[in-house]
From Swiss-Prot:
Keyword ATP-binding part of the UniProt annotation: yes
Keyword set, alphabetical order: ATP-binding, Cell inner membrane, Cell membrane, Membrane, Nucleotide-binding, Translocase, Transport
A single GO molecular function term of this UniProt record: ABC-type vitamin B12 transporter activity
Organism in which the protein naturally occurs: Photobacterium profundum (strain SS9)
Positions of the ABC transporter domain: 3-237
Alphabetical list of Gene3D superfamilies matching this protein: P-loop containing nucleotide triphosphate hydrolases (3.40.50.300)
Coiled-coil residue windows: none
Lineage, broadest ranks: Bacteria, Pseudomonadati, Pseudomonadota, Gammaproteobacteria, Vibrionales
Disulfide linkage: none
Gene coding for it: btuD
Name of the protein described by the UniProt record: Vitamin B12 import ATP-binding protein BtuD
EC number: 7.6.2.8
Length: 253
């Protein structure tokens, strides 16, 4: 087990919720605006204190120092504009500063793979201030993946992403989910807040549905994302249909 959260809370934003995260597991937090998703996943980063107990790799999260946390997990907050002005490759290099002297050829290989996966290879010499919203988000994602890429960081275990697909078009979103699956296949646990319920239905191993700061239900996507639970939580009409062997949600309002 990577992480064990017991009675995680920050009232009234988040009421006590307990869950575990295993190696290679993809966990989605879903729920309406203001339901506590960002609050919950930000606490897993170890940067925000709240109530309850988080055990991360067998040790209390609060007992880790920041350099150790930077090697073991990465936290990508909700999208913000760049605060400073550097080239993309320079920005990506900042992700490596926490790592223990990774081999240069391994770094180059990781960089090539991540940049190709997120389609930013042609952006490496651009200033981050000049990127579009979706391009900047892909650069932020690339930096996050680089920080916890197993081939250059053997201590990496957890990737925490707050609405990573915000600002991405459907093609770039598909590429992002492919990369997330690739990270999970390498044993990295991925926890994310998400609004695209069809993606959650397809991509998540475990889902926590929040409403008004409380966890309404948690479990597998098919158990959690029933029409009744989604309609009552989101106060909108939902239909779930089967299409080519896959469940698909339709929103009629
Ligand atoms: N820094 C803060 N101080 C006080 N209240 C806050 C703070 N940040 C968020 N909140 C409140 O806590 C509640 C939960 O917010 P949170 O950001 O966790 O929701 P969310 O589910 O991630 O929402 P969204 O889908 O809109 O991103 C909201 O009512 C929000 O207004």
């Amino acid at each position: 087990m990577i992480l064990d959260a017991k009675n995680l809370a920050m009232p009234p934003r988040l009421l006590p919720v307990s869950f575990t995260i295993d190696a290679g597991e993809i966990v989605h937090f879903i729920g309406p605006n203001g339901s506590g998703k960002s609050t919950a996943i930000s606490m897993l980063s170890g940067l925000f204190e709240g109530q309850g107990e988080i055990t991360f790799m067998g040790q209390l999260l609060s007992d880790y120092d920041l350099p150790s946390l930077a090697r073991m997990r990465c936290y990508l907050s909700q999208q913000d504009r760049p605060a400073f002005s550097v080239a993309v490759y320079h920005y990506l290099a900042l992700s490596l500063s926490a790592l223990n002297n990774p081999r240069v050829d391994h770094v180059q290989h990781a960089l090539d793979e991540i940049c190709q996966a997120l389609n930013i290879t042609d952006k490496l010499n651009r200033n981050i201030q000049t990127l579009s919203g979706g391009e900047w988000q892909r650069v932020r994602l690339a930096a996050a993946c680089l920080q916890v890429w197993p081939a250059i960081n053997p201590e990496a275990t957890l990737l925490i992403l707050d609405e990573p697909a915000a600002a991405l078009d459907i093609g770039q979103e598909a590429a992002m989910y492919k990369l997330i699956r690739r990270m999970a296949e390498q044993g990295i646990a991925v926890v994310m807040a998400n609004h695209d319920l069809n993606r959650t239905l397809r991509e998540a191993d475990k889902v926590l549905l929040l409403n008004n700061g409380s966890c309404v239900v948690k479990g597998s996507p098919s158990d959690v994302m029933t029409v009744e639970q989604l309609e009552s939580t989101f106060a909108t009409q939902v239909q779930r249909i089967e299409h080519e062997g896959r469940s698909c949600l339709i929103f009629n309002d």
